[in-house]
Amino acid sequence: MAVTINTELDPVFLKALGYLHSKSKDSAEKLKALLDESLCKGNDSVYRPQPKEVEQPKAMLSKVKPETKASSSTPSSSILSKPLASEKVKKEAEKRTADKMKVEINDIMDIPKKPRIEKTEARSSPVTVQLSKDLPVPDLSSFEETSADDFAMEMGLACVVCRQMTVFSGNQLVECQECHNLYHQDCHRPQVTDKDVNDPRLVWYCARCTRQMKRMAQKNQKPSQKPAPSAVSAVTPVAKDPSVNKPELKSKSDSANTFLAFKRAEVKASSAVSSNPSNSGVSSSSASGLTGWAAFGAKTASAVPVSGKLGTNSQATSGKPPSLSSVQKAGTVPGLTPSKAGSVSKSGSGGSSSTIPLKPLPPLILGKTGLSRSMSSDNVSKTGLPSPNPSSSGSVSSLSSQLGSNNGSSNTAGSNVNSSNKVAVDPSMQQSGAKGPTSQESQLNAMKRLQMVKKKAAQKKLKK
């Protein structure tokens, strides 16, 4: 029986459970009023609701048992008189109420949590709204402005001085080609004119870059001034006129060498003439020299009567055979005619002295030299080689001295020898008169062409 007594519940508690499980709207108020009444009656020791009961269901269950014990310990006659069936019904009701208590406790735990969350949200939401209204709005506006300006500055789209992108006529943005900074025409000092802005050919530099460039130029000029004289000395020969004239001088020397090649052959022929004691050797050597000269030019018949005229004039004036040999030598080497004519005339006269035979024949020598120089004076002057004259004259004078020593016995012997030479030399004279001038003209033409080609080549090199 003691067990049944312990299991009985307080009616106040059961009434409270009824209010708790009821779905009516006034159940919460009735439950609260019941709690107040129980507190007023002095049942605090029996039942004390705590806030932890909502959060801890196990503590609630553990408290329910001692409350039932305390309530059952109170003496009551009704409990003793109830039968066992009622006790069983109570047990079942207790089980049901215990299960319902667990469910309700869970519901109670969920119910107060929701208003608390709502309260926290209600408390926190105005704080966030205040933050969004008070702090970020002015900061965002200023940040947007500064970020736009910074972005424009980073991209190089704004003026460096005023940090603005505004552009209108008369105050446009101008970019420095060195530092690539943008300046307004009015912001830059000195101010940029419209002509500088609108001229596409102009490369504009800001004042700072121009100063830096001037300093760099001055620094570069100072060390370069010391080695400048050597560089100038190395460059000046190329820039001066003598360098332009050098290739022409070389061409002239080359042309002189080409003429010297032919003249050397003539000098050898004259030396061969000096070695031969007789005039027949002179005619043969001169003929061989003529064949070499004739190979460079075409034959012309216009020079033949000139040689014939020379021969007739010489025979008519002097009436002596040495004139033919002098005319022959005039045809071979025209620049050497005065000395050779004089030397052969000495051999014809047979005199041992060198000055006496020249006196009776001044007009003959002058006439011959004039005619021969008219044909070949240009060639001698252009070649610029007067050196063979003394050597050839010396060789011929030695030849004349030998002839004079051999034929010094009588004048008739010399005249006979010269007359015999005349017969042998006449055909060679005609050939020399016909071939000599043509070969010289061809040489002149060839040399002119060579000089023109070399001048053109030198001009092309200078242009490059």
Swiss-Prot record:
What are its GO cellular component terms?
Answer: INTAC complex; integrator complex
Q: Name one Pfam family in it.
A: PHD
Q: Where in the cell is it found?
A: Nucleus
Q: Where is the composition biased (Polar residues)?
A: 312-329, 372-382, 428-445
SUPFAM superfamilies the UniProt entry points to:
FYVE/PHD zinc finger
List the InterPro entries. Answer: Int12_PHD (IPR039054), Integrator_subunit_12 (IPR051776), Zinc_finger_PHD-type_CS (IPR019786), Znf_FYVE_PHD (IPR011011), Znf_PHD (IPR001965), Znf_PHD-finger (IPR019787), Znf_RING/FYVE/PHD (IPR013083)
Chief localisation class: nucleus
Compositional bias segments (type: Basic and acidic residues): 85-98
Query: A Gene Ontology molecular-function term?
Result: zinc ion binding
What ranges does the record list as Low complexity composition bias?
Answer: 69-84, 227-239, 339-371, 384-421
Listed A to Z, the keywords are: Metal-binding, Nucleus, Zinc, Zinc-finger
Zinc fingers, PHD-type, are found at 156-212
Q: Name one GO biological process term.
A: snRNA 3'-end processing
User: Where do the record's region annotations for Disordered lie?
Assistant: 42-98, 216-252, 312-445
In the record, the note on similarity to other proteins reads: Belongs to the Integrator subunit 12 family.
Q: Describe the function of this protein.
A: Component of the integrator complex, a multiprotein complex that terminates RNA polymerase II (Pol II) transcription in the promoter-proximal region of genes.
Quaternary structure, per UniProt, is: Component of the Integrator complex, composed of core subunits INTS1, INTS2, INTS3, INTS4, INTS5, INTS6, INTS7, INTS8, INTS9/RC74, INTS10, INTS11/CPSF3L, INTS12, INTS13, INTS14 and INTS15. The core complex associates with protein phosphatase 2A subunits PPP2CA and PPP2R1A, to form the Integrator-PP2A (INTAC) complex.
Protein name in UniProt? Integrator complex subunit 12
- Name the source organism: Xenopus laevis
The organism's taxonomy opens as: Eukaryota, Metazoa, Chordata, Craniata, Vertebrata
